[in-house]
Amino acid sequence: MKKKRLISLLLVFALLFTAAAPTLAAAEEPARRLSVGAEDGAGSRFVSFFNAIREKLAALWNRLRTFFAVRKEKVKNTMSQNAIHMLQSVEDTICDSFIITTEDGKVIVVDGGHTAETDYFIEYLRAVTGQCVPHIDAWFLSHPHDDHVQVFLETAENRAGEVTFDKVLLNFLPYELYESRSQQEGMEMVSEFNRISKAFPEKVQILNAGDVFNIGAAKITVLYAPDESFIDVNEHSVIFRMDLGGTSVMFTGDAQVNAGNKTLAEWESTGLIDCDVCKMAHHGQNGVDRNFYEAVSPEICLWPTPTWVWDNTNGNLKTLEVRAWMEELGVKKNYKAFEGSAVIGMKPRVVTTTDVFEEGYDAATAVDRLAALGCEGIDMGFDYWVFDGSPFLSDGYLPWAQSLKARADSAGIVYTHAHAPGEVDSEYMERSIEATAAIGARYLVVHPIWRDDRGNIIRNKLRFLQINADAIKKWLPKAEEYGVVLLSENVLWGASSDPRIIAELVKKVGSDRFGWCFDVGHAWCCGYAPDVLKQCAVAPMSLHIQDNDSSGDQHLNPGDGTIDWALFTGTLREIGYLGDCVMEAHHQSLYAPDAERDAILTSLLETARSLRAEMR
């Protein structure tokens, strides 16, 4: 412990000296003159020199303090997972700062906060992405107030070597408008943005109401852009909806009653106002009116709110009234920035495997049936398409897969996963990766190699890890080329049955193109209760949900076997699981008459939604 402390102190002093060295070198000549009695301006140069040193040391100290503070928080790396991070204010003041990560590796930022929040923002971003120099794909600025835009301005102008970004999205009204109204803060922030953005005009994207576009897996719908007839700068906040995974999120900036009512008038009939998550307008007080929140009807509210606003310490705010509204509206969870930075996982999509249908089923018709039943995603079982005459085995497998994606698009459903036949060294891996991309799925689940060349079960952990790591690494370039993530699942034999070893395999491979899928039924068959996940070095990126009585791999509906489902959902809550609910309970449906299949699947999906509610 003493040795570690000494190393830390040496590191701090080395960093301090490195930061101070340029200033010392630049000041060498004035300092020399001072030492021989230079008179004119010597005193002021001396003061300037030491002020510069003090400022650099203070800045470096703040960065070091922030670095260790973020490490102490144990910020969750959610790169390539769907999640929202709401950042706390380091000064317990009003500010909006959100980082969103997507399952396809995109990073989105909404606002950022005051200049003083910049060090924390950057360190937090590094922790979230696992990148020394994080890259932001899209940075939204809601409106020109300092507590929303200063982190962007500071980062773009003075910290460009620490963070990169592709584009900044906003709709600021002209400087002249704010000047004519003597709105000082609007004038100042617009002026600063205009000055700084001259260095990157090609990165500026203007948002308008009605814009719809995607940033990777996130779909953005702009519902409101500034109406200059509204006087308050807060009313010039862009309001937009984000759909990500199975969750819809309403971002409101500091919008107030006029902006909220205009948005309702133009969009309420479309159903797009109704969202799972709502960012509270204007920090949760004096924002939009109750009717707006009623239309949003959120399950979760995000409060970028300091303690003194939450408690209405000064007695002149509407926070207590708004809090009462949200309680009356039945909000299930309130995340509050003053309680610390928070990670909000997207609502897991309810997905079912196509293995609920018999081998050789009509894949296109199955898409329509699953969409009509309210399924939110499809897991395409390529393992059920290995037979003579199968389109998956034909030369036309890619056009076939592309036709299924087109069918899913028209039905309003997505393929989220696929399942490869055999193990990771099978002859079908290449076409499985290509077909997974062709149907538009992100994840390809594949079994690990569990037998050696002689057909013997591999029981030695180290041997299992080496054989599978070598096999997986062979396919990573192909997965990268096609935008697919390979997921190994725990199966039933030898080392492959231990979820902890599968998680260790992910660490050994060390690629963002490889993760793992926890099959709760397989684990139960092999003597592992669901809480084994708490012993795994890496959290799973997906789940296979099915039940059994531990005597065999029965793929029953949850509740028809002996798995402890309360333990399962409680463990997922505890580890902060962020993936989908993939139902692999296909036994009952697979062997039922087709006329009974829809009723069976409806019941299965209802069970899945109940589990999802418990997971959150």
Give names to the regions the model predicted.
Residues 103-108, 115-174, 266-285, 297-302:
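Active-site metal-binding motif and surrounding structural segment of the metallo-beta-lactamase
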Residues 68-71, 75-135, 206-274, 342-347:
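Core dinuclear metal-dependent hydrolase active-site scaffold
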Residues 371, 402, 414, 421-518, ...:
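Active-site acidic/histidine proton-transfer and metal-coordination neighborhood
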Residues 348-443, 511, 538, 602-616:
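N-terminal pre-domain/capping segments
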Residues 19-34:
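Sec-dependent signal peptide cleavage junction
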Residues 348-351, 360-374, 437-440, 499-518, ...:
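Histidine-acidic metal/acid-base catalytic patches
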Residues 167, 175-234, 300, 305-347:
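Binuclear metal-ion centers of metallo-dependent hydrolases, dominated by the metallo-beta-lactamase
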